Amino acid sequence: MMRLRERHSIALMALLVALQLLLAIIAGPAALMAQGPEGEFAWPEGKRAAVSLSFDDARPSQVETGLALLDRLGAKATFYVVPVRVETRLDGWKELARSGHEIGNHSMRHPCTGNFQWSRQSALEDYTLQQMREELIEANRRIRELLGVEAVTFAYPCGQTFVGRGPATKSYVPLVAELFLAGRGWLDETPNDPAFHDPAQVTGMPMDGMDFPEVRRVVEGAREAGQWLVLAGHEFGREGPQTTRIEMLERLVPYLQDPENEVWFETVENVARYIRGQQR
C-alpha cells in the first residue's frame, strides 16, 4: 500500500512539473515582450543617447574664449569650478552662470595624490573623510556666495576618489553620493549605462587634444549602446596641453544638435535628474 502511494505521489509531482514547464513555454514570449530588449532605456523624445560637455578647474580660457563660443553655438555645458579661481575672473563667471551653463563643485583646493608635486600640499593621502566633507560643503557655500547658484553635481579632482593611505584608505564616493546629485570621474574608458550606472561615479571621458572624427566615433558608439557620454575638458583653444580644440567644438556641437543624429544634448545636472526620475 505504501509503495502504491509513493508511486502516485511521484506521478503527481511529475505532472505538476510538466504543467509548470508548459506554462513557462506559453508565457515565455509574452513575458519577454513585456520586458522589452535587455538594457533598453527610454531617453526623452525618442533620442537614442545623451551627451554632456563638461570643463574643469575654472580656467581663464573658459570665460575668455569658451563662453562666447558656446553662446554662439547655442550650447550649454557644465563647468566644475574651484572658487579661488572663479575670483580671478569673477565678472566673466557671473556672466557664464547667468547664461544658463551649469556650475558644479570641484572642491576648494583641488586635492589629488601627492605623487603630483604640485598637489603635495593638498595630497589626498593626507586627507580624512571629515576634512573632505568640510571642504566640499565650503566649496558649495563659496559658489553660492560668488555666483548665486547651487552646485548640485561634483567632479572628482584628477578623477581620484580616495583619502588616506594603506589600510586606512577610504573612498569618498559615499560622501559625494550624500552631498550631490552626481559625481563625475575623469579619464574613464566607457560612457555610462543609464540603467546600471552609479550616479556618484559618472564616468567622464576626455576630449582634450582630440579632433572631431575622434570624438564623433565615441559619440556614435554611445548612441549604438544607448549610453550617456560625458565629455570632459579643460582649456578652450587651438593647441596646447589639456586643451579642447575650438575647431572640434565648432563641428561637434552642431552634430549633437542635429535631430537626425538622435542625441539628447544636455548638462550633467539635467541628464542626471532625468535618469533618477526614470529609475524611481
Where are these regions (language model features)?
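Boundary at the C-terminal end of the N-terminal hydrophobic targeting segment
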Residues: 32-34
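Boundary/entry segment of secreted carbohydrate-active catalytic domains
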Residues: 36-63
